[in-house]
Amino acid sequence: KEGYIVNYYDGCKYPCVKLGDNDYCLRECRLRYYKSAGGYCYAFACWCTHLYEQAVVWPLPNKTCL
């Protein structure tokens, strides 16, 4: 599974500036999911790869990022 890492409180994606390989996104994806997850900056948000099927990713139901 793949997807944007999401803030559970406000429903927003984790923003990033440096597109492509990005240490911040990789670190956040691994902290949220597990150490074998991958992560990079895509469309100015952190995209996580190699996730388990039950992983919660953006968009969250009933949460609108403001």
UniProtKB/Swiss-Prot annotation:
GO terms for biological process, alphabetical: defense response; envenomation resulting in negative regulation of voltage-gated sodium channel activity in another organism
Domains (record comment): Has the structural arrangement of an alpha-helix connected to antiparallel beta-sheets by disulfide bonds (CS-alpha/beta).
Domain LCN-type CS-alpha/beta intervals: 1-66
Disulfide partners: C12-C65, C16-C41, C25-C46, C29-C48
InterPro entries in the record: LCN-type_CS_alpha_beta_dom (IPR044062), Scorpion_toxin-like (IPR003614), Scorpion_toxin-like_sf (IPR036574), Scorpion_toxinL (IPR018218)
Keyword vocabulary terms for this entry: Disulfide bond, Ion channel impairing toxin, Neurotoxin, Secreted, Toxin, Voltage-gated sodium channel impairing toxin
Keyword Disulfide bond: yes
Domain of life (superkingdom): Eukaryota
GO CC terms, sorted: extracellular space
Name by which UniProt lists this protein: Beta-toxin Cb3
Tissue specificity comment: Expressed by the venom gland.
Entry function: Beta toxins bind voltage-independently at site-4 of sodium channels (Nav) and reduces peak current and shifts the voltage of activation toward more negative potentials thereby affecting sodium channel activation and promoting spontaneous and repetitive firing. Has an inhibitory effect on voltage-gated sodium channels hNav1.1/SCN1A, hNav1.2/SCN2A, hNav1.4/SCN4A and hNav1.6/SCN8A. Reduces the peak current of hNav1.5/SCN5A but does not shift its voltage of activation. Also affects the inactivation processes of hNav1.1/SCN1A, hNav1.4/SCN4A, hNav1.5/SCN5A and hNav1.6/SCN8A.
Protein's organism: Centruroides baergi
Main location: secreted
SMART domains to which the protein is assigned, alphabetical: Knot1
GO molecular function: sodium channel inhibitor activity; toxin activity
Subcellular location: Secreted
Recorded family membership: Belongs to the long (4 C-C) scorpion toxin superfamily. Sodium channel inhibitor family. Beta subfamily.
